[in-house]
Amino acid sequence: MVDLKKANDRLEELLDCVDHPRKVREGQRLYCGLDLGTAFIVLVVLDEDGNPVDCKYQFASVVKDGMVVDYVGACDIARRLKEQVEGELGVELDECAVAIPPETEALDGGVVKNVAESTGLECTAVFDEPTAANLLIGTTDGAVVDIGGGTTGISVFKDGKVVECIDESTGGTHFSLVLAGAKGMTFDDAEVYKRNPEHHREVLPIVSPTIDKVTTIIERA
Protein backbone atom coordinates (compact mmCIF):
# COMPACT_ATOMS: atom_id res chain seq x y z
CA MET A 1 0.00 0.00 0.00
CA VAL A 2 1.26 3.47 -0.87
CA ASP A 3 2.05 5.72 2.09
CA LEU A 4 0.45 9.07 1.27
CA LYS A 5 1.93 10.93 4.25
CA LYS A 6 4.94 12.18 2.30
CA ALA A 7 2.71 13.40 -0.54
CA ASN A 8 0.26 15.07 1.85
CA ASP A 9 3.09 16.75 3.77
CA ARG A 10 4.53 18.09 0.51
CA LEU A 11 1.13 19.45 -0.50
CA GLU A 12 0.84 21.21 2.88
CA GLU A 13 4.23 22.82 2.21
CA LEU A 14 3.01 23.90 -1.22
CA LEU A 15 -0.15 25.42 0.25
CA ASP A 16 1.95 27.45 2.68
CA CYS A 17 4.03 28.77 -0.23
CA VAL A 18 0.98 30.45 -1.76
CA ASP A 19 1.16 33.21 0.85
CA HIS A 20 4.73 32.65 2.07
CA PRO A 21 7.11 32.06 -0.85
CA ARG A 22 10.55 30.71 0.10
CA LYS A 23 13.77 32.61 -0.42
CA VAL A 24 15.99 31.41 -3.26
CA ARG A 25 19.70 31.88 -3.89
CA GLU A 26 21.02 33.69 -6.91
CA GLY A 27 21.65 31.14 -9.64
CA GLN A 28 19.69 28.43 -7.81
CA ARG A 29 18.18 25.77 -10.08
CA LEU A 30 14.37 25.98 -10.10
CA TYR A 31 11.71 23.80 -11.73
CA CYS A 32 8.27 25.03 -12.83
CA GLY A 33 5.01 23.26 -13.51
CA LEU A 34 2.01 24.84 -15.26
CA ASP A 35 -1.45 23.30 -15.03
CA LEU A 36 -4.32 24.62 -17.15
CA GLY A 37 -7.33 23.31 -15.29
CA THR A 38 -11.03 23.70 -15.94
CA ALA A 39 -11.43 25.72 -12.73
CA PHE A 40 -7.94 27.10 -12.06
CA ILE A 41 -4.64 27.82 -13.76
CA VAL A 42 -1.76 27.00 -11.42
CA LEU A 43 1.97 27.74 -11.57
CA VAL A 44 4.23 25.87 -9.13
CA VAL A 45 7.95 26.35 -8.54
CA LEU A 46 10.21 23.76 -6.85
CA ASP A 47 13.88 23.88 -5.90
CA GLU A 48 16.50 21.38 -7.05
CA ASP A 49 15.53 19.02 -4.21
CA GLY A 50 11.85 19.06 -5.14
CA ASN A 51 10.83 21.31 -2.26
CA PRO A 52 8.05 23.86 -2.94
CA VAL A 53 9.28 27.42 -3.37
CA ASP A 54 6.24 29.31 -4.65
CA CYS A 55 2.74 28.65 -5.96
CA LYS A 56 0.23 30.97 -7.55
CA TYR A 57 -3.18 30.25 -9.07
CA GLN A 58 -6.16 32.03 -10.56
CA PHE A 59 -9.74 30.99 -11.17
CA ALA A 60 -10.31 30.67 -14.91
CA SER A 61 -12.85 29.46 -17.46
CA VAL A 62 -10.46 28.97 -20.36
CA VAL A 63 -10.66 25.16 -20.42
CA LYS A 64 -13.77 23.03 -21.00
CA ASP A 65 -13.77 19.24 -20.68
CA GLY A 66 -9.99 19.21 -20.73
CA MET A 67 -9.62 21.33 -23.89
CA VAL A 68 -8.43 24.95 -24.14
CA VAL A 69 -11.32 27.08 -25.46
CA ASP A 70 -9.90 30.55 -24.74
CA TYR A 71 -6.28 30.57 -25.88
CA VAL A 72 -5.70 34.30 -25.42
CA GLY A 73 -7.25 34.24 -21.95
CA ALA A 74 -5.09 31.26 -20.96
CA CYS A 75 -1.94 33.03 -22.18
CA ASP A 76 -2.82 36.22 -20.30
CA ILE A 77 -3.40 34.41 -17.00
CA ALA A 78 -0.29 32.24 -17.35
CA ARG A 79 1.81 35.32 -18.06
CA ARG A 80 0.42 37.16 -15.02
CA LEU A 81 1.15 34.20 -12.76
CA LYS A 82 4.71 33.96 -14.07
CA GLU A 83 5.29 37.68 -13.54
CA GLN A 84 3.88 37.46 -10.02
CA VAL A 85 6.14 34.55 -9.09
CA GLU A 86 9.21 36.15 -10.65
CA GLY A 87 8.50 39.36 -8.74
CA GLU A 88 8.22 37.51 -5.43
CA LEU A 89 11.31 35.37 -5.93
CA GLY A 90 13.45 38.00 -7.65
CA VAL A 91 14.48 35.59 -10.41
CA GLU A 92 13.60 34.94 -14.05
CA LEU A 93 12.02 31.56 -14.74
CA ASP A 94 13.10 29.86 -17.96
CA GLU A 95 11.70 26.30 -18.18
CA CYS A 96 8.55 24.44 -17.22
CA ALA A 97 6.64 21.19 -17.55
CA VAL A 98 2.92 21.07 -18.32
CA ALA A 99 0.17 18.58 -17.53
CA ILE A 100 -2.80 17.60 -19.69
CA PRO A 101 -5.72 15.16 -19.33
CA PRO A 102 -4.98 11.59 -20.49
CA GLU A 103 -5.46 10.84 -24.20
CA THR A 104 -5.57 14.53 -25.20
CA GLU A 105 -1.95 15.17 -26.19
CA ALA A 106 -2.61 14.77 -29.92
CA LEU A 107 -5.56 17.18 -29.75
CA ASP A 108 -4.50 19.72 -27.13
CA GLY A 109 -0.95 19.00 -25.97
CA GLY A 110 0.53 21.46 -28.45
CA VAL A 111 -1.90 24.18 -27.40
CA VAL A 112 -1.02 23.82 -23.72
CA LYS A 113 2.68 23.85 -24.61
CA ASN A 114 2.14 27.02 -26.66
CA VAL A 115 0.39 28.70 -23.73
CA ALA A 116 3.41 28.00 -21.55
CA GLU A 117 5.85 29.23 -24.17
CA SER A 118 3.81 32.41 -24.75
CA THR A 119 5.03 33.50 -21.30
CA GLY A 120 8.67 33.11 -22.29
CA LEU A 121 9.08 29.71 -20.65
CA GLU A 122 10.58 26.80 -22.58
CA CYS A 123 8.30 23.76 -22.25
CA THR A 124 10.59 20.80 -21.56
CA ALA A 125 8.05 18.08 -20.72
CA VAL A 126 4.37 17.19 -21.20
CA PHE A 127 2.76 14.75 -18.74
CA ASP A 128 -0.75 13.39 -18.48
CA GLU A 129 -2.17 14.63 -15.18
CA PRO A 130 -2.48 11.35 -13.21
CA THR A 131 1.04 10.33 -14.24
CA ALA A 132 2.34 13.72 -13.09
CA ALA A 133 0.57 13.21 -9.76
CA ASN A 134 2.18 9.80 -9.40
CA LEU A 135 5.64 11.35 -9.51
CA LEU A 136 4.74 12.55 -6.01
CA ILE A 137 2.57 9.63 -4.88
CA GLY A 138 4.93 6.89 -6.07
CA THR A 139 2.58 3.96 -6.69
CA THR A 140 4.04 1.06 -8.70
CA ASP A 141 0.96 -1.14 -9.09
CA GLY A 142 -2.45 0.48 -9.05
CA ALA A 143 -4.40 3.41 -10.40
CA VAL A 144 -4.04 7.15 -9.86
CA VAL A 145 -7.31 9.05 -10.28
CA ASP A 146 -7.50 12.77 -11.04
CA ILE A 147 -11.02 14.14 -10.53
CA GLY A 148 -10.59 17.52 -12.17
CA GLY A 149 -12.88 20.39 -12.94
CA GLY A 150 -14.07 19.03 -16.26
CA THR A 151 -12.89 15.44 -16.54
CA THR A 152 -11.93 12.38 -14.53
CA GLY A 153 -8.55 11.07 -15.60
CA ILE A 154 -7.05 7.72 -14.62
CA SER A 155 -3.58 6.28 -15.14
CA VAL A 156 -3.10 2.57 -14.42
CA PHE A 157 0.38 1.47 -13.35
CA LYS A 158 2.03 -1.94 -13.42
CA ASP A 159 5.59 -2.41 -12.20
CA GLY A 160 5.91 1.37 -12.08
CA LYS A 161 4.98 1.87 -15.74
CA VAL A 162 1.81 3.33 -17.23
CA VAL A 163 -0.17 0.59 -18.97
CA GLU A 164 -3.43 2.45 -19.57
CA CYS A 165 -4.76 6.02 -19.53
CA ILE A 166 -8.44 6.96 -19.45
CA ASP A 167 -10.19 10.33 -19.45
CA GLU A 168 -13.95 10.94 -19.35
CA SER A 169 -16.02 14.10 -19.21
CA THR A 170 -17.27 14.26 -15.64
CA GLY A 171 -15.74 16.49 -12.97
CA GLY A 172 -16.23 19.40 -10.64
CA THR A 173 -18.09 21.59 -13.13
CA HIS A 174 -20.74 18.90 -13.46
CA PHE A 175 -21.21 18.97 -9.68
CA SER A 176 -21.71 22.74 -9.94
CA LEU A 177 -24.19 22.42 -12.82
CA VAL A 178 -26.31 19.93 -10.88
CA LEU A 179 -26.19 22.11 -7.78
CA ALA A 180 -27.07 25.25 -9.74
CA GLY A 181 -30.13 23.56 -11.22
CA ALA A 182 -31.29 22.19 -7.89
CA LYS A 183 -30.83 25.46 -6.01
CA GLY A 184 -31.90 27.84 -8.76
CA MET A 185 -28.59 29.72 -8.67
CA THR A 186 -26.02 30.70 -11.26
CA PHE A 187 -23.13 28.40 -12.11
CA ASP A 188 -20.62 30.83 -10.57
CA ASP A 189 -22.64 31.02 -7.35
CA ALA A 190 -22.82 27.21 -7.24
CA GLU A 191 -19.02 27.02 -7.61
CA VAL A 192 -18.61 29.18 -4.52
CA TYR A 193 -21.46 27.53 -2.61
CA LYS A 194 -20.12 23.98 -2.94
CA ARG A 195 -16.68 24.95 -1.61
CA ASN A 196 -18.04 26.18 1.71
CA PRO A 197 -17.65 23.35 4.27
CA GLU A 198 -20.80 24.55 6.03
CA HIS A 199 -22.82 23.56 2.95
CA HIS A 200 -21.32 20.10 2.38
CA ARG A 201 -23.96 18.18 4.31
CA GLU A 202 -26.66 19.86 2.21
CA VAL A 203 -24.78 19.54 -1.08
CA LEU A 204 -23.89 15.84 -0.79
CA PRO A 205 -27.32 14.31 -1.52
CA ILE A 206 -27.83 16.75 -4.41
CA VAL A 207 -24.62 15.75 -6.19
CA SER A 208 -24.69 12.05 -5.23
CA PRO A 209 -25.76 10.93 -8.75
CA THR A 210 -22.74 12.75 -10.19
CA ILE A 211 -20.49 11.10 -7.61
CA ASP A 212 -21.94 7.76 -8.72
CA LYS A 213 -21.00 8.60 -12.32
CA VAL A 214 -17.40 9.32 -11.29
CA THR A 215 -17.37 6.05 -9.33
CA THR A 216 -18.53 4.17 -12.43
CA ILE A 217 -15.72 5.70 -14.50
CA ILE A 218 -13.16 4.58 -11.92
CA GLU A 219 -14.63 1.08 -11.63
CA ARG A 220 -14.50 0.59 -15.41
CA ALA A 221 -10.79 1.39 -15.41
Regions found by a protein language model. Name each.
Residues 153-155:
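A structural feature that tracks compact, well-ordered secondary-structure segments
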Residues 1-36, 42-147, 159-168, 172-221:
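Nucleotide/phosphate-binding catalytic cleft detector across ATP-hydrolyzing
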